C-alpha cells in the first residue's frame, strides 16, 4: 500500500488538479499532465455543434478561416455562441504577420478569456507568437503540423496543442497516422508532457481509433465522422435480435 502522503499526492494530481484546470481553463503546470481521450468537433456550424454538445461527449471545438467562411457568420458571434452553449475550449485562428497575430491573439484572449485557445501556424512568426502567448498562460494550438521536427519546435515554443494533419499527409503519399505515432514516441522518449497531440484533418471513423491508438491525446473531427463512431453493423443486428426476442417475451406474458 502507498503511504498516506503518497496517496494524498496521487489524489491531488489525478482528481483535484484536472478539475481545477478544466474549470479555470488554465494549462496544467509542467510537472503535471492529465491524459485522456478528448474529442473536439472541427466545424463552425453551431447547430451541428449543439447536437454534438448535447451528447455530453464533446470536449472542445476547432475552427479555421475556411470553416468560418462556410458558416457565413461573423467569427466572434460564432465563438460567443459556442461559449454560451457551455464549451470551454474553442480554437480561434489568427492570421497575418507576427505583430498582427499577437495583437489579435491577445484581443481574443482578453475578450473570451479562459475559453479561448489561440490557433497559430507552424511558421517562425507563428511560433514566436506561441512563445509570447504561452508565457502569459494563454492556451495555444499550433496548426499545420506535417513533421516531427515541427512538433518539436512547437513544443519548445510552449504549445498547448500541436495539430498534425493526418488526411493531408495521406494525400501526399505519406503516412498521416504514422506521423502521430512518431510525434508521440518523440515526446515520450524526451519525457515531454506539456504539449498534447491534437490529431486533425481526420476523414474517417477508423482513423479516430487509430489516432488514439498511436498516441493522439485529442481528435478533432467533422460532425459526420463523430456521428459515424456510433455505428456498427453487428450492433444493428444485435439490437434487431434483442427487439424481436423482447416482443416474443411480451407475447408469452399476454
Label every PLM stretch briefly.
Residues 64, 118, 154, 211, ...:
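Conserved, mostly hydrophobic/aromatic
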Residues 57-60, 87, 112-114, 132-140, ...:
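Glycine-enriched alpha-helix->loop->beta-strand junction motifs that scaffold or abut catalytic
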Residues 228-252:
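C-terminal helical cap(s) of enzyme catalytic domains, especially alpha/beta-barrels
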Residues 81-89, 127-136, 178-194, 244-245:
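Alpha-helix-loop-beta-strand connector modules within alpha/beta enzyme cores
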Residues 40-41, 45-49, 55, 63-132:
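Active-site beta->alpha loop and helix N-cap motifs at the rims of alpha/beta catalytic domains
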Residues 65-68, 162-172, 217-235:
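Glycine-rich phosphate-binding active-site loops on the catalytic face of alpha/beta enzymes
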Residues 48-52, 104, 149-156, 203-216:
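Catalytic cores of alpha/beta
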Residues 40-42, 70, 91-97, 115-123, ...:
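Catalytic beta/alpha-barrel core
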Amino acid at each position: 500500500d502507498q503511504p498516506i502522503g503518497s496517496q494524498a499526492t496521487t489524489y491531488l494530481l489525478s482528481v483535484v488538479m484536472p478539475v481545477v484546470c478544466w474549470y479555470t481553463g488554465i494549462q496544467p503546470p509542467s510537472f503535471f499532465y492529465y491524459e485522456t481521450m478528448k474529442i473536439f468537433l472541427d466545424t463552425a456550424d453551431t447547430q451541428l455543434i449543439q447536437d454534438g454538445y448535447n451528447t455530453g461527449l464533446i470536449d472542445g471545438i476547432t475552427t479555421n478561416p475556411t470553416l468560418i467562411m462556410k458558416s457565413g457568420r461573423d467569427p466572434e458571434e460564432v465563438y460567443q455562441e459556442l461559449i454560451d452553449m457551455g464549451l470551454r475550449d474553442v480554437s480561434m485562428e489568427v492570421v497575418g504577420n507576427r505583430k498582427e497575430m499577437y495583437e489579435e491573439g491577445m484581443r481574443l484572449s482578453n475578450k473570451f478569456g479562459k475559453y479561448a485557445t489561440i490557433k497559430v501556424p507552424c511558421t517562425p512568426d507563428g511560433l514566436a507568437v506561441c512563445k509570447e502567448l504561452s508565457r502569459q498562460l494563454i492556451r495555444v494550438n499550433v496548426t499545420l503540423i506535417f513533421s516531427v521536427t515541427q512538433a518539436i519546435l512547437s513544443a519548445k515554443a510552449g504549445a498547448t496543442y500541436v495539430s498534425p494533419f493526418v488526411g493531408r499527409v495521406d494525400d501526399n503519399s505519406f503516412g498521416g497516422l504514422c506521423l502521430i505515432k512518431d510525434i508521440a514516441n518523440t515526446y515520450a522518449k524526451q519525457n515531454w508532457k506539456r504539449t498534447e497531440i491534437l490529431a486533425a484533418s481526420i476523414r474517417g471513423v477508423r482513423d479516430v481509433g487509430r489516432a488514439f491508438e498511436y498516441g493522439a491525446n485529442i481528435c478533432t473531427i467533422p460532425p459526420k465522422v463523430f456521428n459515424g463512431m456510433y455505428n456498427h453493423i453487428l450492433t444493428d443486428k444485435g439490437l434487431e435480435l434483442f427487439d424481436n426476442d423482447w416482443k416474443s417475451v411480451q407475447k408469452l406474458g399476454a
